[in-house]
Amino acid sequence: MKIIHTAIEFAPVIKAGGLGDALYGLAKALAANHTTEVVIPLYPKLFTLPKEQDLCSIQKLSYFFAGEQEATAFSYFYEGIKVTLFKLDTQPELFENAETIYTSDDAFRFCAFSAAAASYIQKEGANIVHLHDWHTGLVAGLLKQQPCSQLQKIVLTLHNFGYRGYTTREILEASSLNEFYISQYQLFRDPQTCVLLKGALYCSDFVTTVSPTYAKEILEDYSDYEIHDAITARQHHLRGILNGIDTTIWGPETDPNLAKNYTKELFETPSIFFEAKAKNKKALYEILGLSLEHSPCVCIISRIAEQKGPHFMKQAILHALENAYTLIIIGTCYGNQLHEEFANLQESLANSPNVRILLTYSDVLARQIFAAADMICIPSMFEPCGLTQMIGMRYGTVPLVRATGGLADTVANGINGFSFFNPHDFYEFRNMLSEAVTTYRTNHDKWQHIVRACLDFSSDLETAANKYLEIYKQ
């Protein structure tokens, strides 16, 4: 089976969030048994092309977007995946000067790339074309209007239903879409506005989200009734599939960043397992200047953004100070107000013996925290899937979550973690923290059972890939 994914980020090349990681994991698992290709734009300021001798092909092609255009497709293989990067030769201003993936002109830029990608797919042929989020939503309409050879199915995965790609009809008219297919993207209430996600929903053969609960949640999203109508119309061709994590990348067995490696098998003698985590905790506390070495350690490894529940993060700080346990927060702030608030907290708590706030992201430090911490807190307002809780469980770190989206699908309260539900109830959140910390301190048998359940949780990529293959073959 030949599968082509189209997206605007892919973790080995460039990424801004979970989409890039999820696509990489899925493509890697599929590539084990199927011809798998990922098509993304080339961002010259953000990624350097492999040397020419490492490329497997360089193709020139034409596409139509705001007139006849030309592009170059550079292809190479990475871990069995064919990666194709598009340089828009006659529209270089769209990507060549971009210093971030996302800019203020995304709809036009991503539609131009989608037009080039669709032209390439029509030329190359594929059995499955798999789109990721609204960014490449135009590809669905273009391939429905002019299918490629051997095309069996167009699949759309919604990594974040909150972003939809609102744009103008004028931009859709710049493509080769005819009036019928433009109407699939158009808002009835405002014919001059088109929504790339809306058209992709109608033009795809199957729609997936990244967790079963998130699939149910988006059917109850009434923030735009026309988008609600579109997703409701596809509900019989909608399925939630949990992302997996790459256990060869994430795991304490061989992670070179840890003070002490450890395995799930060590848990046959729990004291040896917890001794290994304690050695990682001691090493981390020395790095961060923390002193409550024998207290429970809770971590938050997250972007600090409204989606991630920053109001709960502040409550966690207060709770840790009141209850004498360690709290470590690491992540980049999004938004000036949040940055100012957390920078002030960081400064005021700089000498705290049990709280550290690090307003940056370090992959090495994140891994050390996963291994050292006893618990990881993820109080998200919404979470389509979430990989952090799965990574935490791989390291034997118990997740404390809000029961939404993929967090609800992966964490069972009192079984392999702790959860709360109300997105605005500080009392419920603090009760969850208290229960988790008290269990750690006073009920060692129950804590061992919870950690064991975390280690037994299956989050491998192959499970997710097989579920996608079922959809491809339907």
UniProtKB/Swiss-Prot annotation:
<feature type="binding site">
    <location>
        <position position="15"/>
    </location>
    <ligand>
        <name>ADP-alpha-D-glucose</name>
    </ligand>
</feature>
<dbReference type="InterPro" id="IPR001296">
    <property type="entry name" value="Glyco_trans_1"/>
</dbReference>
<dbReference type="GO" id="GO:0009011">
    <property type="term" value="F:alpha-1,4-glucan glucosyltransferase (ADP-glucose donor) activity"/>
</dbReference>
<dbReference type="GO" id="GO:0005978">
    <property type="term" value="P:glycogen biosynthetic process"/>
</dbReference>
<keyword id="KW-0808">Transferase</keyword>
<comment type="pathway">
    <text>Glycan biosynthesis; glycogen biosynthesis.</text>
</comment>
<comment type="similarity">
    <text>Belongs to the glycosyltransferase 1 family. Bacterial/plant glycogen synthase subfamily.</text>
</comment>
<keyword id="KW-0320">Glycogen biosynthesis</keyword>
<protein>
    <recommendedName>
        <fullName>Glycogen synthase</fullName>
        <ecNumber>2.4.1.21</ecNumber>
    </recommendedName>
</protein>
<dbReference type="Pfam" id="PF00534">
    <property type="entry name" value="Glycos_transf_1"/>
</dbReference>
<keyword id="KW-0328">Glycosyltransferase</keyword>
<comment type="function">
    <text>Synthesizes alpha-1,4-glucan chains using ADP-glucose.</text>
</comment>
<dbReference type="Pfam" id="PF08323">
    <property type="entry name" value="Glyco_transf_5"/>
</dbReference>
<dbReference type="InterPro" id="IPR011835">
    <property type="entry name" value="GS/SS"/>
</dbReference>
<dbReference type="GO" id="GO:0004373">
    <property type="term" value="F:alpha-1,4-glucan glucosyltransferase (UDP-glucose donor) activity"/>
</dbReference>
<dbReference type="InterPro" id="IPR013534">
    <property type="entry name" value="Starch_synth_cat_dom"/>
</dbReference>
